[in-house]
Amino acid sequence: MKYELIKKQGRARRGQLQFDRGTVETPAFMPVGTYGTVKGMTPEEVKDTGAEILLGNTFHLWLRPGQEIMKLHGDLHDFMNWKGPILTDSGGFQVFSLGKTRKITEEGVHFRSPVNGDKIFMDAEKSMQIQYDLGSDVVMIFDECTPYPATHDEARISMERSIRWADRSRNEFDRQENPNALFGIVQGGVYEDLRDVSVEALTKIGFDGYAVGGLAVGEPKEDMHRILEHTCPLLPEDKPRYLMGVGKPEDLVEGVRRGIDMFDCVMPTRNARNGHLFVTGGIVKIRNAKHKVDTTPLDPECDCYTCQNYSKSYLHHLDRCNEILGARLNTIHNLRYYQRIMASIRKALEEDRFEQFVEEFYARRDREVPPLKDL
């Protein structure tokens, strides 16, 4: 993988990630394909929304279908027929999400399979091995996602363990002679001094890119913005920066304002299945009764297949009847909406009018632009 920083405006960065499997324009949003599929979509449909890179889930793909089935096909690209690059998370967040059913030790994490209740152990080395078998273009280190809230001491202990696991991840990745990219993950909760320690340790180990982890786990937006404003300037300028698990459309804009290049989130797909559809002015709740007789498209400004061919009335009908097509059309629209935002951000950066884009983005939502700490 090669990263090229093409242009900057303030902290916002316009760049390019170059892989053997294709080029990814940044800032980029990655749809989430947890089980080797973006729910309800064919790979061709996902590509048509503008997506250039997908996220796969190491933890879930390890449990089902497992490494052996994956290797029968070649790798995850072959298994799901996605021709472009794939980033896989390490499984750390999913293990963190298991709550009381898991036990964290220095060696790794003991837990019970959410599929069949079997006792399972995962560590940094195992995560690297699974991701190697998946053929991931971007491999994430195995880390511990610090919960919120956490005391300074709890966050410090968690962050220090993540650093040791990062070192083990790097060593195993190098032992495999994996030709792909390995990203480190900055932890430290909402504490700036701990983020400093994490960044220093990770950059000393050396990675192809750096993720900011442990955010969007329940902390106030102000804390997320503060940590991003503090952390991003500490990261190497010539490496991509990835904000994990984020987020709402405004979170993408705020992340870019603070120097982030890559995002992923289940929100556009999950919300689509629940009838919450993103449009230029905000959100349409398609199951509301008022849409029953509305023959207009979902978003007149959208060029997606759904908006070009169907009315709000039809989408409302599909939702009320619980038709699979409704979830599919909604997902096509929401994914395209996210990709249109990213394309608009990239164009605004190319044309040196990113600040104007931000003002217009919030004006259309009747909201104030959130404050940004001066450079």
Curated annotation (Swiss-Prot):
Binds 1 zinc ion per subunit. One of its GO terms (molecular function) is metal ion binding. GO terms for cellular component: cytosol. Signal peptide: none annotated. Disulfide bonds: none annotated. Zn(2+) binds at residues 302, 304, 307, 333. Its cofactor is Zn(2+). Keywords: Glycosyltransferase, Metal-binding, Queuosine biosynthesis, Transferase, tRNA processing, Zinc. It comes from the Bacteria. Residues 245-251, 269-273 are annotated as: RNA binding. Pathway: tRNA modification; tRNA-queuosine biosynthesis. The active site is at 89 (proton acceptor), 264 (nucleophile). It catalyses: 7-aminomethyl-7-carbaguanine + guanosine(34) in tRNA = 7-aminomethyl-7-carbaguanosine(34) in tRNA + guanine. Homodimer. Within each dimer, one monomer is responsible for RNA recognition and catalysis, while the other monomer binds to the replacement base PreQ1. Belongs to the queuine tRNA-ribosyltransferase family. Catalyzes the base-exchange of a guanine (G) residue with the queuine precursor 7-aminomethyl-7-deazaguanine (PreQ1) at position 34 (anticodon wobble position) in tRNAs with GU(N) anticodons (tRNA-Asp, -Asn, -His and -Tyr). Catalysis occurs through a double-displacement mechanism. The nucleophile active site attacks the C1' of nucleotide 34 to detach the guanine base from the RNA, forming a covalent enzyme-RNA intermediate. The proton acceptor active site deprotonates the incoming PreQ1, allowing a nucleophilic attack on the C1' of the ribose to form the product. This is Queuine tRNA-ribosyltransferase. It comes from Aliivibrio salmonicida (strain LFI1238) (Vibrio salmonicida (strain LFI1238)). The gene is tgt.
